Amino acid sequence: MAEGKIFTVSVTVGQETTTANLIYSKAKTYNLPLYAILSPSKVKGYIFIEAPNKSAVEEAIRGIRHAKRVLPGEIPFSEIEHFLEEKPAVSGFEPGDIVELIAGPFKGEKAKVVRVDESKDEIVVELVSSVVPIPVTVRGEYVRLISKRQKE
């Protein structure tokens, strides 16, 4: 397989995923030579497309509503590699943080983080509203941070 080059496409902010899906559909329908499409959630207004040349990317975005233009130049893989590394959902939480449970049987409840287990992607919390503190283990994606622990 030929070595792909990575190009940056400017898109409407907030429409990155939609635009990437439309480009993917067009590439599949018309058998365009695109190798990969990356729409990182942390990057607003841009998506990255791997293709053999710039003209393949320009053909893919032609007629796509929210795709504006292909930026000049290529992006080295090392610049976008960190977007591909999966971080556990519990990274960033510390004991003492106040969180809100956003899924499961305790949805909507506020809780205090007791322990974080990054290897299992789980957090042990104590519900703030309960009279007796009972530790509850929940998955990392079931919590949303409300406030960080106050440092002395």
Curated annotation (Swiss-Prot):
A single GO BP:
regulation of transcription by RNA polymerase II
According to the UniProt entry, its GO molecular function terms are: translation elongation factor activity
Is Transferase given among the entry's keywords? no
SUPFAM superfamilies reported in the protein's UniProt record: Translation proteins SH3-like domain (SSF50104)
Task: Report the main location listed first in the record.
Answer: cytoplasm
Its subcellular locations are:
Chromosome
Phenotype upon knockout? Essential, it cannot be deleted.
Source organism superkingdom: Archaea
Keyword annotations from UniProtKB, A to Z: Chromosome, Transcription, Transcription regulation, Transcription termination
Which CDD domains does the protein's record reference? KOW_NusG, NGN_Arch
Entry-linked Pfam families: KOW (PF00467), Spt5-NGN (PF03439)
User: What HAMAP family does the record point to?
Assistant: Spt5_arch
Question: According to its UniProt entry, what is the function of this protein?
Answer: The Stp4-Spt5 complex stimulates transcription elongation on both naked DNA and histone-bound DNA (chromatin), facilitating transcription through the histone barrier. Neither protein functions alone. The complex also stimulates the transcription termination activity of FttA, neither protein alone nor the KOW domain of Spt5 stimulates FttA-dependent termination.
Q: Which family does it belong to?
A: Belongs to the archaeal Spt5 family.
NCBIfam families named in the record: KOW_elon_Spt5
Subunit: Heterodimer composed of Spt4 and Spt5. Interacts with RNA polymerase (RNAP). The complex interacts with FttA.
Q: Specify the protein name.
A: Transcription elongation factor Spt5
What is the source species? Thermococcus kodakarensis (strain ATCC BAA-918 / JCM 12380 / KOD1) (Pyrococcus kodakaraensis (strain KOD1))
